[in-house]
A protein has these predicted regions:
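Alpha-helix N-cap/loop-to-helix initiation residues
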Residues: 7-8, 127
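C-terminal cap of thioredoxin/glutaredoxin-like
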Residues: 1, 15-19, 95, 102-207
Length: 207
């Protein structure tokens, strides 16, 4: 997911809606991902000038910085990390805030995250390496743009299902309940996924 993307934010909420209402035991993990294609997609969605190279570079850097911020927050625990992500997205998409250090400081002052440790971690090589590993995992799973959702079922670990764009609670529920895969290009079966255990179960379902 793109931590600054409005469509990703909506799809995350659809996933959480599924988790709340599901009969399955669901483990999920939000993984940040960006490349030139996702930046182009973001600019198009925001109706920005895609020919403005300076703006493109600025947005690329901003998304990367937000991804590192999320990884740094996660180092202080899964719950604080997700709280940071959701508050960041809420401020951007509901209050039209710009992503900058002022917003980060404001968020950090209101959640249970050590600010000094956060900034030290964010600037560290370890966080950058962790993010690069996320990118590698996403690429191995054939993720090319955001939002994307990869679903694994513990009863059949040889493949996962990649859902691009059309991520709704209803669609996820249909897939998890064993209904025929929707006949649309957004749904793909991934055979012999090598990254499954590395990702620590993006989404696992157990009845």
């Amino acid at each position: 997911m793109n931590p600054l993307g409005s469509y990703c934010y909506r799809c995350e909420n659809e996933l959480l809606k599924f988790v709340r209402n599901s009969e399955f035991k669901v483990h999920y993990q939000f993984v940040t991902f960006h490349n030139l294609q996702t930046v182009n997609q973001y600019m198009k969605n925001q109706k920005l000038d895609e020919t403005d190279l300076d703006l493109r570079n600025e947005i690329y850097t901003r998304i990367y910085d937000a991804a590192l911020s999320y990884k740094a927050a996660l180092l202080q625990g899964k719950r604080p990390g997700r709280q940071f992500l959701f508050e960041l997205q809420h401020q951007i998409h509901h209050h039209n805030r710009n992503y900058n250090k002022e917003l980060l400081d404001e968020i950090l002052d209101n959640i249970e995250i050590d600010k000094k440790m956060f900034y030290e971690d964010k600037a560290s090589a370890a966080v950058k390496t962790a993010y690069d590993r996320d990118l590698q995992i996403a690429q191995e799973m054939n993720v090319t743009h955001t939002p994307s959702l990869v679903i694994f079922d513990n009863s059949n670990q040889s493949y996962g299902i990649l859902l691009d764009n059309s991520i709704t609670a209803d669609t996820i529920s249909e897939i998890c309940n064993g209904e025929p895969l929707p006949k649309c290009p957004e749904v793909k079966r991934i055979v012999e996924v090598r990254s499954r255990h590395n990702l620590a179960k993006v989404v696992n379902m157990n009845r």
